[in-house]
Swiss-Prot record:
Keywords: Cell projection, Cilium, Flagellum, Ubl conjugation. One of its GO terms (cellular component) is radial spoke. It comes from the Eukaryota. Sumoylated, sumoylation decreases upon spermatozoa capacitation conditions. GO terms for molecular function: identical protein binding. Component of the axonemal radial spoke complex 1 (RS1), at least composed of spoke head proteins RSPH1, RSPH3, RSPH9 and the cilia-specific component RSPH4A or sperm-specific component RSPH6A, spoke stalk proteins RSPH14, DNAJB13, DYDC1, ROPN1L and NME5, and the anchor protein IQUB. Interacts with FSCB; the interaction increases upon spermatozoa capacitation conditions. May interact with AKAP3. Interacts with CFAP61. Functions as part of axonemal radial spoke complexes that play an important part in the motility of sperm and cilia. Important for male fertility. With ROPN1, involved in fibrous sheath integrity and sperm motility, plays a role in PKA-dependent signaling processes required for spermatozoa capacitation. Residues 17-46 form the RIIa domain. Its main location: other. The lineage of its organism: Eukaryota, Metazoa, Chordata, Craniata, Vertebrata. Signal peptide: none annotated. GO terms for biological process: epithelial cilium movement involved in extracellular fluid movement; flagellated sperm motility; regulation of protein phosphorylation; sperm capacitation. It comes from Homo sapiens. This is Ropporin-1-like protein. The keyword Ubl conjugation applies.
């Protein structure tokens, strides 16, 4: 015989005072992050919250690119989330990193493909993984370094996106070493040319304007120089 439903009055139901704010913050986080699998992401969110770890939450909403119509691929925003969760460690265990990857609803196949660029066994240097992620976002070395600067910078969004030249040169050398089309001589020559400007400023920082030139601006510059020659 089924038990009768128990009736409770309002005075008997205790709602933790912090619950409304927790749910409010969770809802805002879900809207900003737009996870492909809400249940999986929610499990990762509350697991991180209970441990006091950085949450798997984007700083802002991202519009999916033409190759990411369902927003399930790696983006700069998701890579920045991983950086917030892992940057305090010099080396990250692959099992822990893979779990964080899954919590962001990213395909396991893409995680494996990324690691195949520079195979390792149980753990990876975080800055190396971040560099590999940036290379997956951008086709060229300079585009990958652009993503790196925008993720690591302390400058406000839309600013010069400056990072220490020491970090920039380490990542450039690391990615160039994995690219068979770039010789060590070309790498060192390029970094030396950048370092001249950095040393002149005496702040040890490099920003996007020092090395990244969008194609449109480059074409305009070429056209202007041709006009001057006529």
């Amino acid at each position: 015989m089924p038990l009768p439903d128990t009736m409770f009055c309002a005075q008997q139901i205790h709602i933790p005072p912090e619950l409304p704010d927790i749910l409010k913050q969770f809802t805002k986080a879900a809207i900003r992050t737009q996870p492909a699998d809400v249940l999986r992401w929610s499990a990762g969110y509350f697991s991180a919250l209970s441990r006091g770890d950085p949450l798997p939450v984007k700083d802002r909403m991202e519009m999916p690119t033409a190759t990411q119509k369902t927003d399930t691929g790696l983006t700069q925003g998701l890579l920045k989330v991983l950086h917030k969760q892992c940057h305090h460690k010099r080396y990250v265990e692959l099992t822990d990193l893979e779990q964080k990857w899954k919590n962001l609803c990213l395909p396991k196949e893409k995680f494996k493909a990324l690691l195949q660029l520079d195979p390792c066994e149980n753990k990876i240097k975080w800055i190396n993984f971040l560099a590999l992620g940036c290379s997956m976002l951008g086709g060229s070395l300079n585009t990958a370094l652009k993503h790196l600067c925008e993720i690591l910078t302390d400058d406000p969004e839309g600013g010069p996106a400056r990072i220490p030249f020491k970090t920039f040169s380490y990542v450039y050398r690391y990615l160039a070493r994995l690219d068979s089309d770039v010789s060590p001589l070309e790498t060192e020559s390029y970094l030396a040319s950048l370092k001249e400007n950095i040393d002149a400023r005496k702040n040890g920082m490099i920003g996007l304007s020092d090395f990244f030139f969008p194609k449109r601006k480059l074409l305009e510059s070429i056209e202007n120089s041709e006009d001057v020659g006529h």
